[in-house]
Amino acid sequence: MICYKCGQDAGWNDKCPVCGADLSLFKRAIRISNSYYNDGLQKAQVRNLSGAIISLRQSLKFYKYNIQARNLLGLIYYEMGEMVDALSEWVISANYQPDDNLAKKYIDQIHNNRNQLETINQTIKKYNQALTYCKQDSKDLAVIQLRKVLSLNPKLVKGHQLLALLYLEEGHLDKAKKALRDAGKIDTDNTTTLRYLKEVNRRLKEKGTERKKKNDDLISYQSGNETIIMPKRFRESSMWANILLSLIHI
């Protein structure tokens, strides 16, 4: 345990052997931090990544030197396609604990892979361009740009979500649903994904109801070799007119 006052290793004592600071409350904060870390780990194991991020951030609020929590947070960001955020957490982790730290391995793996570095740069550039197109109401161009982003970085959850939102606004409900399902495969309980999916399903249900109503308003019958389709109201009106004519001739 690192003493909050002098920054030295204090073991697990109630008082720092170096500066004499009272560490009893500090130890409690560390225990709470570890509890949040365990919760985040459990959520990550079932791919509730957004929920895991919330728990791990809480863990680091109570104890910023929780290296395991910070490294796991970086891994989750990486899994969600947020490579810059992942690197940021690992750099902080490596600064807090330079020795015997997996964060340094993660950083080296990315820095030694030029293709991955280029992917990171292109992802940022193209995603920001897609946002610019959205602000300019150039939705078609934004969709094209987002497809390029996701071909480079298929795990970028926010890319799938933005693409789904654009499809939703354009009425392409099946495409929107597919984009949201792709996002859900990465992060199962993301509230934004679930909210968008609920709206897509609502609109699909309305569309299905309208189609059924439209079909119910049509009737078809065979006339020789031809199938005649006409509005039901027209048929009913014609029948009523024929009845009136027959009454007149009586």
Identify the meaning behind each predicted range.
Residues I248-I250:
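Conserved small/polar residues in nucleotide/adenosyl-binding loops
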Residues A29-A44, N71, T119-C134, Q161:
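Alpha-helical tetratricopeptide repeat
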Residues S33-N34, I67-Q68, N101-L102, T123, ...:
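Helix-start (N-cap) detector for alpha-helical repeat units in TPR-like alpha-solenoids
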